[in-house]
């Protein structure tokens, strides 16, 4: 809720919000801001799982490890001493061909902020502590980790810099994650 109150201070979000806007020669167009999906993309824990409709982006996240202390990704390079299950990775994908009116998946890439667009982001909501591994439209592709390939994918994405462009929300989202309290405005929004 704190992130949502922050977003409402942005002039474009404040103007459009979640509303219909009359577009000449088109008619009414619904503008929707996925606050929870955006929060997840900026590192705020939510019930949303990030997907991408770009294979290079998905591959980057499948072959890298994230260090929360340094806030950097590094290529995952297995050595001969790792456990068998750590030698394999998984690439999750959302099967759009399964007929289902699933509203858990929605695009984030067309937003007013850089990061979701750079990652071709999709948000998938996991309601009620559901397990991603048993969701009918979520499929898995297993692969064997290879250090050379991990480094190649990592370097092709400029060590992640292409996926994490700096924008106005990055610093603010980090501040929100460090808070142990919330504003009254955020609490009131959450309580609705």
What are these regions (language model features)?
Residues 1-192:
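Catalytic-core elements of nucleic-acid end-processing and repair enzymes
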């Amino acid at each position: 809720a704190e992130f949502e109150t922050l977003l409402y201070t942005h002039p474009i979000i404040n103007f459009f919000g979640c509303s219909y806007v009359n577009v000449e020669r088109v008619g009414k167009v619904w503008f929707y801001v996925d606050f929870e999906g955006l929060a997840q993309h900026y590192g705020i824990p939510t019930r949303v799982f990030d997907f991408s409709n770009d294979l290079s982006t998905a591959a980057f996240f499948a072959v890298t490890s994230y260090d929360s202390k340094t806030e950097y990704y590094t290529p995952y390079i297995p050595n001969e001493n790792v456990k068998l299950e750590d030698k394999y990775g998984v690439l999750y994908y959302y099967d759009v061909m399964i007929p289902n009116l699933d509203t858990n998946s929605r695009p984030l890439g067309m937003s007013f902020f850089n990061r979701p667009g750079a990652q071709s982001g999709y948000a998938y909501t996991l309601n009620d502590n559901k397990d991603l591994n048993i969701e009918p439209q979520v499929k898995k592709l297993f692969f064997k980790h290879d250090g050379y390939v991990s480094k190649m994918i990592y370097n092709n994405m400029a060590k992640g810099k292409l996926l994490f462009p700096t924008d106005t929300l990055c610093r603010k989202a980090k501040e929100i994650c460090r808070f142990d309290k919330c504003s009254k405005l955020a609490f009131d929004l959450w309580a609705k």
